[in-house]
Amino acid sequence: MAEHRSFTDYVRTRFDSNFWAVAEEYLKNNIDDLDLNLYRVHRIGEIELSDVKVECVWVHDLPGMKIQFDVALSIDFLIHEGDYHYDDYDEKKIWIMVRCRGDLAQDLKDFEIYQCCEYNGKNVSKNPMDDALVPVLYPNNLDAEAEAFLRRYHFHKCLLEPCWVQPDELAKAMGLTIRMVNLTKDGSIFGRCYFQECETELYDAESDSMVKETIPARTILVDRQAAFMSNIGRLNNTIIHECVHWDYHQKAFALARLYDKTLSILGVP
């Protein structure tokens, strides 16, 4: 089961060389326009990067598995004296904003920096995600989120008038398969959603042992014993819960897979 991973840490490590390159290019193109307040240097000479740090990352949700993310970079650099009569330098730091995008379905191999500008401390998103790539939901916006969820899977009738959403119909609309199995011997696990095909262990009542079975991706397993011992409402709620889990945590799972390709499920609080 996957633990929550940090997108900021991943970006900081994987794209470090990209950020150094864009920082160097930014200084090259903008050094004359920066308000640097030089104290030792009489004339700007060679610019030497000393450090480039990812200070903060803001992620914006896009359709499918795509994301857009803004990265605040701090750039430490030396400005060497350009007048050969002097031999001195000034140490300076600036912040810039780097706007990036990529597709998690491609493991961000299509990563692109499409804009670089001065950092102004402001960043607003209509579809923010947290550092684990889980959509940020606000209490005063839950109705709108529910409506958007129903629209994504073409349950338009529920938007016209209140109606019950059949769990099996929702799962089918989402391309998910529901199976009743014995997840454990004691029924302690009610349901589980598999994002990726994998081999897992299920309880076999005949042999009274755990047996291995390959579970396809996009499968929801519901524990047969737990379902039998509870009411239909809890069963339906479990299926709906796993469907929502699939929808809202696909990108969090994709991030976890960037750290560990063996993962097939994602644990959430």
Predicted features along the sequence, with ranges:
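Short juxta-domain linker segments that transition from a proline/glycine-rich
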Residues: 1-269
